[in-house]
From Swiss-Prot:
Record's GO cellular component terms: endoplasmic reticulum membrane; Golgi apparatus
Membrane topology, Lumenal segments: 147, 194-195
Keyword S-adenosyl-L-methionine recorded: no
Domain of life: Eukaryota
Lineage of source species: Eukaryota, Metazoa, Chordata, Craniata, Vertebrata
Alphabetical UniProt keywords: Endoplasmic reticulum, ER-Golgi transport, Golgi apparatus, Membrane, Protein transport, Transmembrane, Transmembrane helix, Transport
UniProt protein name: Protein YIPF5
Topological type in the membrane: Multi-pass membrane protein
Free-text function comment from the UniProt entry: Plays a role in transport between endoplasmic reticulum and Golgi.
Gene from which the chain derives: yipf5
PANTHER family: GOLGI MEMBRANE PROTEIN YIP1 (PTHR21236), PROTEIN YIPF5 (PTHR21236:SF6)
Compartment list: Endoplasmic reticulum membrane; Golgi apparatus, cis-Golgi network membrane
Cytoplasmic-side segments: 1-125, 169-172, 217-235
InterPro entries, alphabetized: Yip1/4-like (IPR045231), Yip1_dom (IPR006977)
């Protein structure tokens, strides 16, 4: 028994009294203290207490329903887009279409004796050539000849051949777009020949003479522009010969 008494004395702390067990225990108070001790308080994490009256307080809306308040200032267009629309170039300029240059190139082809501007002719402009190719095919269609495939195919092969030939002959070199542009603009006299084919038949002496004049007109204009743009002085005849072969094929399509 003495050992058992010593065990009880060692088990309990010296400040603990068995008589305290007889006192009543308030579960509600203890539970409230326990929940208060371990409850999560979101406002304590922010470092301060916010009174309830400040949480319920709202700023009154002083503006009207369909009108913003005076303090609202919309963002400027410059800050959103970086620059105004007035500073942007026109759409035709971004696409590389210049009607002034197109008109000057057309006049250069229509006037074979006019001096060509090498700076303008060296540009890659395919808007005018596409229009002239469509016009040439349309006039052939009016004459009862559906030859759009031949027109585009011969044009592509001719441009490729002239591109290779001019790069071999010139010192500066030339781009494929420049060759296509010049040959396309010089197709304009051939549209006149196909327009005559709509009115009367070209299978005769008059048609052959007219076709020869148109071929010489086209080849002379194309060679003049190539000589001016590529600085190939004294080589116009050498350039005009392959051009005459190309436009001769178009003349055969128009006549026959």
């Amino acid at each position: 028994m003495s050992n058992f008494d010593n065990f009880n004395t060692d088990f309990y702390q010296t400040s603990y009294s068995i008589d305290d067990q007889s006192q009543g225990y308030n579960y509600n108070a203890g539970g409230a203290q326990h929940s208060k001790q371990y409850a999560y308080d979101p406002y304590s994490q922010q470092g301060g207490f916010i009174p309830p009256e400040m949480m319920n307080q709202q700023q009154p809306y002083t503006g009207q329903i369909y009108q913003p308040t005076q303090t609202y200032t919309p963002a400027a267009t410059d800050s959103v887009y970086g620059s105004t629309f007035d500073d942007e170039p026109p759409l035709l300029e971004e696409l590389g279409i210049n009607f002034d240059h197109i008109w000057q190139k057309t006049l250069t082809v229509l006037h074979p004796l006019k001096v060509a501007d090498g700076n303008i002719m060296n540009e890659t402009d395919l808007a005018g050539p596409m229009v002239f190719c469509l016009a040439f095919g349309a006039t052939l269609l009016l004459a009862g000849k559906i030859q759009f495939g031949y027109v585009y195919g011969i044009s592509a092969i001719g441009c490729l051949g002239m591109y290779c030939l001019l790069n071999l002959m010139s010192m500066t070199g030339v781009s494929f777009g420049c060759v296509s542009s010049v040959l396309g603009y010089c197709l304009l006299p051939m549209i006149i020949l196909s327009s005559f084919a709509v009115i009367f038949s070209l299978q005769g002496i008059l048609g052959i003479v007219l076709a020869a004049l148109i071929i010489g007109w086209c080849s002379f204009s194309a060679s003049k522009i190539f000589i001016s743009a590529l600085a190939m002085d004294g080589q116009q005849v050498l350039v005009a010969y392959p051009c005459a072969l190309l436009y001769g094929v178009f003349a055969l399509i128009s006549v026959f």
